Design a protein with these regions (language model features):
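HAD-like aspartate-dependent phosphatase fold
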Residues: 3-142
Length: 142
């Protein structure tokens, strides 16, 4: 269920070309797999991956975001040896997505440092609409 990636906007700063940006309003969703779109299965038990229990509302919400034009990329701690069984599972259930990045570090407590805008949403059991909310965040001191 792969689709052509969107046209990125070429960007320059101080007369030099820099990494391109997404069009306004478009999001790059990086979505975990185990415990987020299906039951949590550790890499040590790959025989369970083909029959992982789906979280139906995840399928509904992610496909809605895909249909709205956002980029859907799965970012998982599963390894390359799990890619085929994972892609087969995603396709069997009808997930629409653009790509999958394997080998996310395990253990949680992620802290992403980037020169681009980053938002993080912790999955706590339900895929609902995303809403704006203020929170305390850690930033680099000026």
């Amino acid at each position: 269920a792969h689709m052509k990636k969107p046209t990125l906007i070429e960007t320059t700063e101080n007369g030099k070309r820099v990494s391109p940006k997404l069009p306004p309003g478009m999001k790059n969703f990086l979505i975990d797999i185990d415990g987020t779109i299906c039951e949590d299965i550790p890499n040590e038990e790959p025989e369970r991956m083909a029959d992982a229990a789906l979280f139906p509302e995840a399928l509904e919400k992610l496909n809605k975001w895909y249909d709205e034009g956002h980029i859907i990329t799965f970012f998982t701690s599963r390894t390359e040896e799990h890619r085929m069984v994972t892609e087969e599972w995603l396709n069997k259930h009808g997930f629409k997505y653009h790509g999958m990045v394997m080998g996310k570090p395990r253990g949680g407590n992620y802290h992403w440092i980037d020169d681009r805008e980053v938002r993080a949403t912790r999955y706590e059991g339900h895929f609902t609409d995303l809403v704006e909310r203020s929170a305390t965040v850690q930033v680099f001191e000026d």
